[in-house]
C-alpha cells in the first residue's frame, strides 16, 4: 500500500492549532481595520515575469514555478508585487492614499529549517500614495498594536532609515545598483552580528550553530583567498580564515562578525569605495540605542545633503511615532533590510524568545517600487508579519488564554431527550453561541468527559428538570453546577 506523507516544509493544523491561528487572525484583522485598512485578496500564483521583474531570473531558484497554457507562473513568495500589479493596471477606482491589508499563504523553494517553512503565511499592510513621515509612523504603530493585541509582549522594535547608507554612497558617486549590493553586504553583517550574539549567550553551542559558523567560515575563506590572490590585500591578520579555522569553531563565534566586516571592507575598497567611506559605512552600522543618544551622535558624524535629509526624515518619523504612543523602540542605523527596494524608513520587530528566527515583522518605505513595475511615481510604505511566527510568539508568552472551541455542549440523560437537545442547541446558535450535541450514543459520564475537552460549559438535560422548565448548567472549569430556566440559559452563559 502506498504511504502518503506531508510535503516537506509544510504543516497541518489540527483543530486546537487552527483555533489559535484563527483567534490571532481575527485580532490582526480588527487591528488593521481600526486604522482604516481594507482587506484585499490576490491569486496565490502570478506570472513569473511579474515576480522576476525586479529580482531577475535568479529568483527562480527560490520559487515554485510551473507552465500552464504556454505561460510560466510562480507561487507567490510575497504579496507586494501583486499589490503593485493592481495599482499599475489602473483598476483601482478609489481615492489615495490606498490602505490595503492581506492575510494569506506564500511559498519559497528552499531547504526547510526550524520555524522557516516552504509554505508560510504573511499578514501585511500597504499604505500607498503618501510621502508623509506620519504614514511611516502609522504603519509602524499598526505593527506594534497588532503584536500587543495578540498578547506578544517583550518584542524589540528597531527603526532606522536606509537613505543614510544610500546618501553616503551617493555622495561618493555610486549608482543605485552598487548601493544595493553594498547595502546587501551591510544587511548580511547585521544579521551575522545578531546570530553570533545569540550563540554567545547560550550555555552550549548547538549543532545548527556550528553548521552556521562553518558555512560562513567556508564562504569567508573563499572570499579572502580570492582577494589575496588578486593582490587586493596581503593579509587579514587575526581575522584571516585559514583551513584550520573549521577546527576552532567556538573561537570563531565571537570573531566571525568582525571577520565579515574586514572582508567586505576589502571588497568595497577593491571596487572603488574610498577607505574613509568604507569605514564610515561600518561605523554607522554599529550605531544604535535610545533616540536621545543616537540622533545627536549621527548628526555630528554624518554630513552631506542626502544623508542629512534622511536623518531629518528619521527624526520626524520618530516624533510622529511617539505621538501615536509608541515609545518602546530602539534607533538602529544599521537596519538595512535584505530587500533592495527600500528607499527611506526601515524597521523590524524581533521577538527574542524565538531564537535564531526571532524576526516577526519587517518593512519600510519603498517610493520607487510602483514606478519600477511600470506605474507612475507613487510613494508607499508597508510591512509584512510572518504570521506563523506571531502565533508561535504568542504561545511562548505565559498566561495567554487559549481560545475556546465550543461555548456549550448539550448532554442528555438518555436518548429520548435528543430532540430537545437539538432544539436548545439551535436556539443558542441563533443567539451567537457555539453549541454541540451528542452524536455517538455515549452515556452521561462519557458525554461530560468529552465536553470537558471541547467546551466551556455543559448543559445537562434530564426528564425531571425539563418538566420544571429547567436544565443543569455546569461550568467545566470550576465543576460548579447550577439549575437554570431554559428561557434564561443564554443569559446564564454570559
Task: Annotate each PLM feature.
Residues 17-35, 46-49, 80-92, 100-153, ...:
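Positively charged, Gly/Ser-enriched RNA/tRNA-binding surfaces
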Residues 38-44:
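A short beta-strand-loop structural module common to alpha/beta enzyme folds
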Residues 44-73, 116:
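Polyanion/phosphate-binding surface patch
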Amino acid at each position: 500500500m502506498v504511504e502518503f506523507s506531508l510535503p516537506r516544509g509544510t504543516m497541518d493544523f489540527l483543530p486546537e492549532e487552527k483555533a489559535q491561528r484563527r483567534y490571532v487572525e481575527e485580532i490582526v484583522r480588527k487591528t488593521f481595520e481600526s486604522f482604516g485598512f481594507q482587506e484585499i485578496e490576490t491569486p496565490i500564483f502570478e506570472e513569473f515575469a511579474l515576480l522576476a521583474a525586479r529580482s531577475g531570473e535568479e529568483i527562480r531558484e527560490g520559487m515554485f514555478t510551473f507552465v500552464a497554457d504556454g505561460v510560466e507562473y510562480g507561487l507567490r513568495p510575497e504579496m507586494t508585487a501583486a499589490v503593485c500589479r493592481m495599482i499599475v493596471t489602473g483598476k483601482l477606482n478609489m481615492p489615495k492614499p490606498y490602505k490595503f491589508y492581506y492575510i494569506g499563504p506564500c511559498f519559497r523553494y528552499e531547504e526547510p529549517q526550524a520555524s522557516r517553512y516552504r509554505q508560510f503565511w504573511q499578514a501585511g499592510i500597504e499604505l500607498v500614495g503618501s510621502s508623509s513621515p506620519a504614514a511611516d509612523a502609522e504603519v509602524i504603530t499598526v505593527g506594534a498594536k497588532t503584536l500587543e493585541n495578540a498578547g506578544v509582549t517583550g518584542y524589540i522594535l528597531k527603526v532606522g532609515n536606509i537613505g543614510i547608507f544610500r546618501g553616503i554612497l551617493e555622495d561618493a558617486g555610486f549608482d543605485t545598483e552598487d548601493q544595493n549590493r553594498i547595502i546587501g553586504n551591510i544587511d548580511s553583517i547585521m544579521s551575522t552580528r545578531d546570530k553570533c550574539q545569540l550563540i554567545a549567550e547560550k550555555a552550549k553551542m548547538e549543532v545548527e550553530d556550528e553548521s552556521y559558523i562553518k558555512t560562513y567560515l567556508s564562504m569567508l575563506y573563499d572570499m579572502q583567498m580570492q582577494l589575496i590572490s588578486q593582490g587586493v590585500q596581503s593579509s587579514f591578520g587575526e581575522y584571516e580564515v585559514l583551513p584550520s579555522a573549521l577546527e576552532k569553531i567556538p573561537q570563531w563565534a565571537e570573531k566571525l562578525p568582525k571577520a565579515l566586516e574586514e572582508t567586505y571592507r576589502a571588497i568595497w575598497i577593491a571596487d572603488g569605495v574610498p577607505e574613509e567611506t568604507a569605514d564610515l559605512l561600518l561605523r554607522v552600522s554599529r550605531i544604535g540605542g535610545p533616540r536621545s543618544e543616537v540622533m545627536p551622535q549621527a548628526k555630528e558624524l554624518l554630513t552631506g545633503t542626502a544623508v542629512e535629509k534622511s536623518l531629518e526624515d528619521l527624526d520626524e518619523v520618530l516624533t510622529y511615532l511617539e505621538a501615536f504612543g509608541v515609545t518602546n523602540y530602539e534607533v538602529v542605523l544599521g537596519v538595512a533590510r535584505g530587500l533592495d527596494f527600500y528607499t527611506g524608513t526601515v524597521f523590524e520587530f524581533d521577538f527574542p524568545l524565538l531564537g535564531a528566527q526571532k524576526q516577526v515583522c519587517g518593512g519600510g518605505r519603498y517610493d520607487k517600487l510602483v514606478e519600477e513595475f511600470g506605474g507612475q511615481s507613487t510613494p508607499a510604505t508597508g510591512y509584512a508579519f510572518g504570521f506563523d511566527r506571531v502565533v508561535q510568539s504568542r504561545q511562548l508568552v505565559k498566561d495567554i488564554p487559549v481560545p475556546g472551541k465550543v461555548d456549550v455542549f448539550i448532554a442528555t440523560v438518555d436518548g429520548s431527550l435528543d430532540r430537545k437537545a437539538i432544539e436548545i442547541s439551535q436556539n443558542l446558535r441563533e443567539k451567537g453561541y457555539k453549541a454541540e450535541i451528542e452524536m455517538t450514543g455515549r452515556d452521561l459520564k462519557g458525554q461530560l468527559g468529552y465536553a470537558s475537552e471541547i467546551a466551556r460549559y455543559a448543559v445537562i438535560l434530564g426528564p425531571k428538570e425539563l418538566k420544571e422548565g429547567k436544565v443543569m448548567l455546569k461550568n467545566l472549569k470550576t465543576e460548579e453546577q447550577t439549575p437554570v430556566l431554559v428561557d434564561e440559559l443564554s443569559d446564564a452563559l454570559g
